[in-house]
From Swiss-Prot:
Pathway info: Amino-acid degradation; L-histidine degradation into L-glutamate; N-formimidoyl-L-glutamate from L-histidine: step 2/3
Lineage, uppermost ranks: Bacteria, Pseudomonadati, Pseudomonadota, Alphaproteobacteria, Hyphomicrobiales
Record key words, sorted: Cytoplasm, Histidine metabolism, Lyase, NAD
EC annotation from Swiss-Prot or TrEMBL: 4.2.1.49
Cofactor descriptive note: Binds 1 NAD(+) per subunit.
The keyword Lyase is assigned to this record: yes
GO MF annotation terms: urocanate hydratase activity
Name assigned to this protein: Urocanate hydratase
Length: 557
């Protein structure tokens, strides 16, 4: 019997200003869905897998075809409902309602675990949407580069006087998210040694210029790192190997990186983490015929890697969990002090979240890189005093290869996001851009996620696991007129450990879009400021007052 999730076809988004749907508000999700499965973007496009283990864009290829066909015929007073990658209904709404509403991987909490999800998945009743895979706004590894860069820069500021020159970062994983690490490290001025078990992924990062070199030899990798750091060069190398083997070996040798982290797909112990002593081929085969054995061996291996990370931490080396839930897996395997080292959000990112600053991104539906160059210039024009952001944009232009439709990631917050959106819409209206722009973000944002082992770890008031916030975020973005809105479970850290929401809005050059953009791109980051103000963070409380937010039970207004 043929696999409904496997097809050798090649999918690429249409380019240019010619519509395939009835309006740009339906053309936009159509193009971004297809862009998610572009072979230059997705990790395993023939299996509908975009990134993050088994994060898919659609449940089956038949469902993909149905979504495409429906978007092509959808009217401006209709909304398509997508349930875990399956187009289940079209309903009459109104022109300011989202054209698509998406719910992916959501389970009643008692059943929210990998075993139950995998059973549903096997029966064709569910799909893992990760964060931006099933919400159709993945832009390749660039999508996480700036966040990783900001993290490394802040780590350098806290631990090394703001200068990472001559320093190096040890990490694991070069998948859709982890692949950003070597480039982010180099941009921050550091060298990077990234361990990756699947050579095809390392080759993907070489091809897209996210990593500089590749080796199968630990000795060679260390020699290169030593030479580069002594010369003050910032370069990166991918080491083909297993992080659960390499990390302990480095501890044994007494090697001391300057920063240690990990972005293997440890959140998914069946599909995301190679067990010690296994070949990749053996691992892939047993995922299908003996997933329990894979999970058991992978979890045991994660414990070994986390113990090595603890050894680095205890040696005084800054060590952080980069949000893949590997500490939780090790804890469940009996490593009682697995959480001794922090996650990256409480360690480095939370002050940004308190001001609603997060991973704002946009893509040029024209397919023309010049449209991104023009929007980059507009960002600089509108935010003339943000030299750190200007530096990022300059480096991004020089170092980041576009994957699929040209796109840009740019961390900005409440008070700036809507200004940029309105400016982009004006550029579409006056013909400065060749076609509309879509603006979205990662679900990893200040007000759109509840994830106690990642974004909401160690909240000041203990509200780490309260998931009302992403639900309110999704509801508000729907009411505000986002073009499509998504509500997911399990992204980043796996089943049972997170709930999160996403939104995308289209700048089609119309005055209606102006009104929607002003609402959505103000309200969306404002929920993040609200969430952190409610938790008692002074930065968020001050920012809420400065921006004039009305928060009755928080500010008394």
């Amino acid at each position: 019997m043929s696999n409904p999730r496997h097809n050798e076809r090649e999918v690429r988004s249409p380019r240019g200003d010619e519509l395939n749907a009835k309006s740009w508000l339906t053309e936009a999700p159509l193009r971004m869905l297809m862009n998610n499965l572009d072979p230059d973007v997705a990790e395993r496009p023939h299996e509908l897998v975009v990134y993050g283990g088994i994060g898919r864009a659609a449940r089956t290829w038949d469902d993909f075809d149905r979504i495409v066909a429906t978007l092509k015929t959808l009217n401006d007073n209709e909304t398509l409902l997508v349930q875990s990658g399956k187009p289940v209904g079209v309903f009459r709404t109104h022109k300011d309602a989202p054209r698509v509403l998406i719910a992916n991987s959501n389970l009643v909490p008692h059943w929210a675990n990998w075993d139950h999800f995998n059973e549903l998945d096997k029966k064709g009743l569910a799909m893992y949407g990760q964060m931006t895979a099933g919400s159709w706004i993945y832009i390749g590894a660039q999508g996480i580069v700036q966040g990783t860069y900001e993290t490394f820069v802040e780590a350098g500021r806290q631990h090394y006087g703001g200068n990472l020159k001559g320093r190096w970062i040890l990490t694991g994983g070069l998948g859709g998210m982890g692949g950003a690490q070597p480039l982010a490290a180099v941009m921050a001025g550091a060298c990077c040694l990234a361990v990756e078990c699947d050579e095809t992924r390392a080759d993907f990062r070489l091809r897209t210029r996210y990593v500089d070199e590749k080796t199968h030899s630990l000795d060679e990798a260390l020699a290169k790192i030593d030479a580069w750091t002594k010369a003050g060069e910032a370069k990166s190398i991918a080491l083909i190997g297993n992080a659960a083997e390499i990390f302990p070996e480095l501890v044994k040798r007494g090697v001391k990186p300057d920063i240690v982290t990990d972005q293997t797909s440890a959140h998914d112990p069946v599909h995301g983490y190679l067990p010690l002593g296994w070949t990749v081929a053996e691992w892939r085969a047993k995922q299908e015929n003996d997933p329990k054995a894979v999970e058991k061996a992978a979890r045991a291996s994660m414990k070994v890697q986390v113990q090595a990370m603890l050894d680095f931490w205890n040696a005084g080396i800054p060590t952080v969990d980069y949000g893949n839930n590997i500490r939780q897996m090790a804890l469940e395997e009996g490593l009682e002090n697995a959480f001794a080292f922090p996650g990256f959000v409480p360690a480095y990112i939370r002050p940004l979240f308190c001001r609603g600053i997060g991973p704002y991104r946009w893509a040029a539906l024209s397919g023309d890189p010049e449209d991104i160059a023009k929007t980059d210039a507009k960002v600089k024009e509108l935010l003339p005093d943000n030299k750190h952001l200007h530096n990022w944009l300059d480096m991004a232009k020089e170092r980041i290869a576009f994957q699929g439709l040209p796109a840009r990631i740019c961390w900005v917050g409440l008070g700036d996001r809507h200004r940029l959106g309105l400016a982009f819409n004006e550029m579409v209206r006056n013909g400065e851009l060749k076609a509309p722009i879509v603006i979205g973000r990662d679900h990893l944002d200040s007000g759109s996620v509840a994830s106690p082992n990642r974004e909401t770890e160690a909240m000041k008031d203990g509200s780490d696991a309260v998931s009302d916030w992403p639900l309110l975020n999704a509801l508000l973005n729907t009411a505000s007129g986002a073009t499509w809105v998504s509500l997911h479970h399990g992204g980043g850290v796996g089943m049972g450990f997170s709930q999160h929401a996403g939104m995308v809005i289209c700048c089609d050059g119309t005055e209606d879009a102006d009104r929607r953009l002003e609402r959505v791109l103000w309200n969306d980051p404002a929920t993040g400021v609200m969430r952190h103000a409610d938790a008692g963070y002074d930065i968020a409380l001050d920012w809420a007052r400065k921006q004039g937010l009305r928060l009755p039970a928080i500010l008394g207004n």
